[in-house]
Amino acid sequence: MIARIWSGESPLWRLLLPLSWLYGLVSGAIRLSYKLGFKRAWRAPVPVVVVGNLTAGGNGKTPVVIWLVEKLQQRGVRVGVVSRGYGGKAAAYPLLLTPETTTAEAGDEPVLIYQRTGAPVAVAPERAAAVKAILAAHNVQIIITDDGLQHYRLARDIEIVVIDGVRRFGNGWWLPAGPMRERASRLKTVDAAIVNGGVARAGEIPMQLAPGLAVNLRTGARCDVAQLSNIVAMAGIGHPPRFFATLEACGAHPQKCVPLADHQTLAPADVQALVGEGQTLVMTEKDAVKCRAFAEDNWWFLPVDARLSGEQPDKLLQHITSLVR
């Protein structure tokens, strides 16, 4: 229903317009207060790069963060990552991730980024506190914040927006009548707009999510996902249909697709109940970090990597590395 409202297919969005106007006025006033200096943002002693969205819902932001961290690491840059830690609840904040940190404490995306990149990762509702925790424990040269475009309390040097190239901005309205956290005109002020799928427009960086080999959660064995049979697909991400379409494109044809809420807590019994005798469970990598501790032999995940095309990605990386002292 939400997808139909935000796309404009359902007329119910009109009933939510008063709340959307209120949301837009409040969010605009907050941004203006920082822009005019009525409120002060905290500036870190190292450059800060924000990777965020203008819309609610999954746009492919986490793969972009991983891509950016890995590309900077390849250039010899010491990178730290901060996040709000959605879906997690730590005993105390800021929380600096360790190999023992669970998704229940830090959230699924921070744990995934930590495991994929090995970069220092910290979570806190107040992102400045997370930055300070990393700087106190690690000699990093740059901070990447996973989400937080609208978190103006943290000053930033580079802003990168990730856009779903198929859904783009839906009906164009602020939450809750539409998907917008800020108006599309905000694109004029960011440093880069990366478009996941669909057709990129002038000045935007095209991106595709490239699937790798399926990985067994228990053994680490790898195989072409099309070789798996009797698949039940599970996706607890911002836009589950994207994952199901990826499986189809890879030649894997699920018998059943189970969409879950983004950052949803997964109980062992609930996940086990999805898979019948002789079936194979295939999930996203973000779900896998929550399920690995209780995984069965026939559970697999399909990793995806961001692939950015054209000359603009290299120019963006050069611009970012030029800020590093």
Swiss-Prot record:
Stated EC number for the protein is 2.7.1.130
What's the protein name?
A: Tetraacyldisaccharide 4'-kinase
Q: Which GO terms describe its molecular function?
A: ATP binding; tetraacyldisaccharide 4'-kinase activity
Q: Which organism is it from?
A: Salmonella typhimurium (strain LT2 / SGSC1412 / ATCC 700720)
Show the GO cellular component annotation of the record.
plasma membrane
> Does the keyword section mention Lipid metabolism?
yes
Q: Which reaction does it catalyse?
A: a lipid A disaccharide + ATP = a lipid IVA + ADP + H(+)
Q: Pathway, per Swiss-Prot/TrEMBL? A: Glycolipid biosynthesis; lipid IV(A) biosynthesis; lipid IV(A) from (3R)-3-hydroxytetradecanoyl-[acyl-carrier-protein] and UDP-N-acetyl-alpha-D-glucosamine: step 6/6
